[in-house]
Amino acid sequence: MRKISLAFLLFSCLNKLTAQTTSVDALALKIPEASTYATSGLVNYLKQNFYPDSARVRAIYVWIANNIAYDVPRLLAKNANGEFKPQPSEDVLKTRAAVCQGYATLFVDLCTGLGVKAVLISGYGKIANTITPSHAWVGVEMNGNWYLFDPTWGAGYVQNNRFIKSFNNIFFKVPPEQMIKDYMPFDPMYQFVNHI
């Protein structure tokens, strides 16, 4: 009987967590367009409609990954050093397109506007056994722990120089010990892994 009660309790908690995430996702996808053309508008909407900070961060990930397309022309126009022209958040919101630096900058700016500690991380990423020459993702501190997010690869992928929208959760709130398998920050401090 005790095992059945424990199994039921575990199932109930898991079901509630899934329902909460589904609810946050549904609300994030319905953010009014008028609130999405400036970081201040998005921050205000998120403050008023999502709580706690974990729900706000989830809403940021879901909204960005579903509303910002990968900017393939910008990818192809990078300079000789493989660098992109900086892309401020307001430009990303205006064009609804970005490369990884723009996705990450917008994510960090929204978190910062909400009082959530976040950092933009640059380094190498590996996807489909191919190492990217340069990539950007986000570190967010939640409840005293650091988690990593990649809204770029959470939005979809590029195939034959075309962006294919394909939202996924693989790159949402990834523990550092897992992220290090496919991501290497230029600054080792942003591994957030204790090697001692």
List where the protein language model places each region.
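Short capping loops/turns at secondary-structure boundaries
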Residues: 12, 93, 97-100, 129-131
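A generic structural signal for ordered secondary structure
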Residues: 19, 42, 46, 139, ...
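Short, solvent-exposed coil/turn segments
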Residues: 18, 86, 131-133
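Hydrophobic/aromatic-rich core segments of domains that either
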Residues: 102-178
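Secondary-structure boundary elements
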Residues: 21-99, 105-108
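Bacterial Sec-dependent N-terminal signal peptides
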Residues: 1-22
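Low-complexity, Gly/Ser/Thr/Pro-rich intrinsically disordered linker/tail segments
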Residues: 169-196
